[in-house]
Amino acid sequence: MQNFTFRNPTKLIFGRGQIEQLKEEVPKYGKKVLLVYGGGSIKRNGLYDEVMSLLTDIGAEVVELPGVEPNPRLSTVKKGVDICRREGIEFLLAVGGGSVIDCTKAIAAGAKFDGDPWEFITKKATVTEALPFGTVLTLAATGSEMNAGSVITNWETKEKYGWGSPVTFPQFSILDPTYTMTVPKDHTVYGIVDMMSHVFEQYFHHTPNTPLQDRMCEAVLKTVIEAAPKLVDDLENYELRETIMYSGTIALNGFLQMGVRGDWATHDIEHAVSAVYDIPHAGGLAILFPNWMKHVLDENVSRFAQLAVRVFDVDPTGKTERDVALEGIERLRAFWSSLGAPSRLADYGIGEENLELMADKAMAFGEFGRFKTLNRDDVLAILRASL
């Protein structure tokens, strides 16, 4: 394995009723709070009233930023930065899923940055400080509640990029599975695809001697595969929501990537697709990932065969290693389809008309990917296979 240094300062507060911990945690950082949330689901399920009541109890002065988009936009980040500066915000509280948290990270950094936030999002500048923030998670998917990463879309230029900084870890994150029980089936499935994709990005590498990392990844995948079909048939099952929520956090909080270097090419391609078409991120991943896998298979057939046998229970008897690997990829595709995830870009009405544009967007920073370095022809081939 590779040398590594691990650090994750986020305090994770997990379980039923843990929302009460807001009264303990928020006062550590100040009274002037920016409450960031999305399209209004937290008002429909009662969480908004609960949070506001707790913040009132501790004497917090709350300013609100509602309406964060599913693919959070630079314009919303800038709006939040302006509020922070104008109102003297001391602490931000993100109540929502990964998009709300990602947006909050960019606002927290932007409020302390002398310049356009797009500069650090596109890695042309570095942030050295950020306002403190915490999260209350309502959707198990991205892992943003316990990492420093964020993805922001510039809708005007049709660009979407991931970024991160050591200063953009949440101070704390409250994870009560109860608040995910009203998430509808389609978004539940998107979350499942997203967390599995995060594991795949860290599983596909060429680093030797990573038996524990491999088994940890495989354990998360097996756990999700066992729980997911039950959950989509029983959306209000607390134990299943609990399992999926914890899995999503573990999938991208740094535990699985210690000593390895993941790939992340599929995410980069999907960012280009959803920058142009504004489709759900995980929907794009469900379509692209099996096709990326088939495209890069011959870079390390053994690793794909290992996944097929250990995670998808492919029987290798009498089969070539490559056939085992291919069967594993098709079992993944079939599993996601069985949950109701999309399998073709056509499912979103996407055809060939913008393939070249999406390839150009994906190649904005040059060739990418570590498992196999992808050039423009590779990206186009994966996109065409995904139509």
Curated annotation (Swiss-Prot):
Pfam families linked to this entry: ADH_Fe_C, Fe-ADH
Temperature dependence: Optimum temperature is 60 degrees Celsius.
SUPFAM superfamilies assigned: Dehydroquinate synthase-like
GO cellular component, one term: cytosol
Alphabetized UniProt keyword annotations: NAD, Oxidoreductase
Keyword RNA-binding: no
Keyword Amino-acid biosynthesis: no
Record field: pH dependence: Optimum pH is 8.0.
EC annotation from Swiss-Prot or TrEMBL: 1.1.1.192
Molecular function terms from GO: alcohol dehydrogenase (NADP+) activity; butanol dehydrogenase (NAD+) activity; long-chain-alcohol dehydrogenase activity; metal ion binding; methylglyoxal reductase (NADPH) (acetol producing) activity
Record field: catalytic activity: a long-chain primary fatty alcohol + 2 NAD(+) + H2O = a long-chain fatty acid + 2 NADH + 3 H(+)
Residues binding NAD(+): 98-102, 138-141
Role played: Long-chain alkyl alcohol dehydrogenase that can oxidize a broad range of alkyl alcohols from methanol to 1-triacontanol (C1 to C30) as well as 1,3-propanediol and acetaldehyde. Oxidizes isopropyl alcohol, isoamylol, acetone, octanal and decanal. The best substrate is 1-octanol.
Similarity comment: family membership: Belongs to the iron-containing alcohol dehydrogenase family.
Self-association state and partner proteins as the record states: Homodimer.
The protein's name in its UniProt record: Long-chain-alcohol dehydrogenase 2
Organism expressing this protein natively: Geobacillus thermodenitrificans (strain NG80-2)
